[in-house]
């Protein structure tokens, strides 16, 4: 019974290391986290003046924090 337990543990260890190797190792999740952390929230963009808040005059959707420029004014979310 003890040998069977050890055998199962070794098999589980081998399967988990194989899964790490096939998925690109430990670097891939770190890259995703780094990519996602570069994005700013809407509040941060507004606070730093990178986009316009609700009810401001606008000429295109991209300059509004909400992404909606309706009748020349930024729309609320």
Curated annotation (Swiss-Prot):
Tissue specificity as recorded in UniProt: Expressed by the venom duct.
Residues cleaved off as propeptide: 20-49
Annotated signal sequence range: 1-19
Alphabetized InterPro entries for the sequence: Conotoxin
One Gene Ontology term of the molecular function aspect: ion channel inhibitor activity
Coiled coil: none
GO CC annotation terms, alphabetical: extracellular region
Disulfide bond entries: 51-65, 58-69, 64-74
Keywords in alphabetical order: Disulfide bond, Knottin, Secreted, Signal, Toxin
UniProt subcellular location: Secreted
This protein's domain notes: The presence of a 'disulfide through disulfide knot' structurally defines this protein as a knottin. The cysteine framework is VI/VII (C-C-CC-C-C).
Recorded family membership: Belongs to the conotoxin O2 superfamily.
Name of the protein in its database record: Conotoxin Lt7.1
Organism (species): Conus litteratus
